[in-house]
Each structure stands twice: as C-alpha cells, then as structure tokens.
From Swiss-Prot:
This is Small ribosomal subunit biogenesis GTPase RsgA. Its cofactor is Zn(2+). One of several proteins that assist in the late maturation steps of the functional core of the 30S ribosomal subunit. Helps release RbfA from mature subunits. May play a role in the assembly of ribosomal proteins into the subunit. Circularly permuted GTPase that catalyzes slow GTP hydrolysis, GTPase activity is stimulated by the 30S ribosomal subunit. The lineage of its organism: Bacteria, Pseudomonadati, Pseudomonadota, Gammaproteobacteria, Pasteurellales. It holds the Pfam family RsgA_GTPase. Transmembrane segments: none annotated. One of its GO terms (cellular component) is cytoplasm. GO terms for molecular function: GTP binding; GTPase activity; metal ion binding; rRNA binding. InterPro entries: G_CP_dom, NA-bd_OB-fold, P-loop_NTPase, Ribosome_biogen_GTPase_RsgA, RsgA_GTPase_dom. Its EC number is 3.6.1.-. Residues 1-26 are annotated as: Disordered. The keyword RNA-binding applies. One of its GO terms (biological process) is ribosomal small subunit biogenesis.
Length: 346
C-alpha cells in the first residue's frame, strides 16, 4: 500500500522539529564557559547559517561562532560583540554575545514565521531588473516601497541591456523615466559587455549595499564581474516560468577592492508586502507625500472618493498615472494575499 503523501504543513513541521533537535544537540555539545573565552571584541557578521555565524574582527580575520541563547535574531551586516575561544571546539572559534542596535534592516515576510530579517545596517539597496523575459515595473515598485519605509537609498539597475535593440532600449528608457522624474537613480548596465559597470562599481564603494531582485535577473553575473574571486554560481532562466533557479544559499557580505561592502542574498521570487497596511504602502510612494493629508475625507481610499487630492494630482499631471495604477494594484494584491494567508493558517 502506497504511503499517504504529507501535506506542506506536515512537511514543514517535520523539518522544523528536526532542525530544533539538531540545534539542541549542538548546544549540548558546545558549552562555552568564561574561562574558555578571551576578551570581548567588536565584529561584523559576514555570513549567517542556521546555528552559526561567521564574524569578521577589526583586523579582517573571520571566525565561525556560536550564538548566545539570549540573541533573538542575527543577520548579515549586524555589528556584534563576540569573544574568541582559547581553542576551537568542533570547528567553532567563539561566541557572539550581543548585537549593537541596527541603523536599519530589511526583512521579507514568511507565511509561517512572520517577518524574517535578511540584512542590517545597509546604505543602499541595488534593485536589479532585467529586460528578459519582460521588465516588471510592479516588482520595482515593491522594492521601492521597502526602501522608502526602511529609509534606505535605492538604485534601480537594469541588467542585460546588451540584449536590446536600439528601439527596444528607447522604449524601456521611456518607461523608466517615471522613476527619474521623482528622484530615483537609474543605471542601465551589462555584465556581459561591461557597459556602465565602472559607474556601478563607483557607487558600490559608498558604504554597504545589497542586491535584490528576482532570480534570473543577473545578480550572480554582476557579482562575478565585480568580484571574480567569489565565483558566484549563475542560474539560467527557466523557459517555462521565466524565472531563474535559486543559486545563492546563504546571505554573505563581501568587501570590494575599491572600497565599500556588498551583501549577496538568496533571490526572492515574490517580494511579499502582506505585513504592511495600506497606510504604510501609501507612504512608500515618495511622490504621494506632498498631497497626503489634504484629501476632503480622512478615510479617503484615493479611488473615486470625492475631494481626493491624490487623484486630482494625477489628473493634473503632477503624479504619474502608471505609478498611481501600480499603487492600487499593490493595495488590491495586499488584501488578496492576506485573505489567502489567513485561509492557509486555519
């Protein structure tokens, strides 16, 4: 008799219980006492694994560390206080004891575990899009909402422009003008031909940046161009879905030769925003801010409501109708996703 196939929830519970068991086992095996540890020192998390993290000290040396049980979360980019062990235990060299307050963080929503932090202390988010299979302004808008809410400067990068004919390129430049008009910086590049790669490298030298974007847009190819020694695995775009295969398994922080840091994180196929409410989404559209609060009614939905200042600004040509429509599609998808998520948890 064939075994009954496990449901997705059952599979997740089994995996979760297995991970917790392994976690408890590891903690029992490695118990650090004060006598086994050196003085406290500063460090930065450069890679986070399930129960360990790689920490870089002020001299640029990297050590694999355990986490104190009191630490609730730890992500790449976190500035930490840690102690080096007098000797290695099972390949582990020390313990992370505290996390400094974060300047900012970006998170992605997890349908079962709530918000899952990805990285912290970021100066710039590089939103990577590609011309194939199609340019999605909706995906760009989702990332821009995240940037605005987190207070992190975005850079919109359009990769693989070498695949465009001149007429196609002009059409895409026209599409992207709505972002330039409201102050967003755009860079059209090609990791293959090298177009504008020097400009991207110069921008990356200004602090800590993170690449975000769907799989298959060329993030790994860009990293290989910027940091050839890293040799990030490149994934092909699926012919059926138009999406690339996930090629990065753990987020990691790299130091760039010209200065600055780059965080590479696993591709996110759908950057969900269901953890945000409509008011937060609205604040994620920077060009809306000067009219917010001036509508006739406080509960204005910015649709056909009488006296809607936002809609009037669109009609007067002060706000792009493309961005206005994108905003409402995002609000609608937010409601649909929340109801689906609620249903899946019942």
């Amino acid at each position: 008799m064939a075994k009954r196939k496990l449901t997705q929830n059952q599979t997740r519970r089994i995996q979760s219980n297995n991970a917790k068991t392994l976690h408890r086992h590891k903690k029992k095996d490695i118990e650090w006492s004060d006598e086994m540890l050196g003085e406290s020192q500063e460090g930065v998390v450069v890679t986070r694994y399930s129960i360990h993290a790689d920490v870089e000290n002020e001299q640029g040396e990297i050590y694999r560390c355990n986490l104190r049980r009191t630490l609730s979360s730890l992500v790449v980019g976190d500035k930490v206080v840690w102690r080096k062990g007098n000797e290695q235990l099972q390949g582990v060299s020390g313990v992370i004891e505290a996390i400094h307050p974060r300047e900012n963080e970006i998170s992605r929503p997890d349908y079962y575990d709530g918000l899952k932090p990805i990285a912290a202390n970021i100066d710039r988010i590089i939103i990577v899009s590609a011309v194939l299979p199609t340019l999605s302004l909706n995906i760009i808008d989702r990332y821009l909402v995240v940037c605005e809410i987190a207070g992190i400067t975005p850079l919109i990068v359009l990769n693989k422009v070498d695949l465009l004919a001149q007429e196609q390129r002009q059409e895409i430049e026209d599409q992207l003008k709505i972002y330039q008009d409201i102050g967003y910086e755009i860079l059209m590049i090609s990791a293959k031909s090298g177009e504008n790669m020097e400009k991207l490298t110069a921008l990356l030298a200004q602090g800590t940046a993170i690449f975000v974007g769907q799989s298959g847009v060329g993030k790994s190819s860009l990293i290989n161009h910027i940091l050839p020694s890293v040799n990030a695995q490149v994934g092909d775009v699926s012919e059926t879905s138009g999406l690339g295969q996930h090629t990065t398994t753990s987020s990691r922080l790299y130091h760039l030769p010209q200065g600055g840091n780059l965080i590479d994180s696993p591709g996110i196929r759908e950057f969900g925003l269901w953890h945000l409410d409509a008011e937060q989404i609205t604040k994620g559209y920077r060009e809306f801010q000067y009219v917010l609060g001036t509508c006739k009614f406080r509960d204005c939905k910015h649709l056909s409501d009488p006296g809607c200042a936002l809609r009037e600004a669109v009609e007067q040509g002060k706000i792009s109708p493309v961005r206005y429509d994108s905003y409402h599609r995002l609000i609608e998808s937010l409601s649909e996703t929340k109801s689906q998520r609620h249903f899946s948890l019942v």
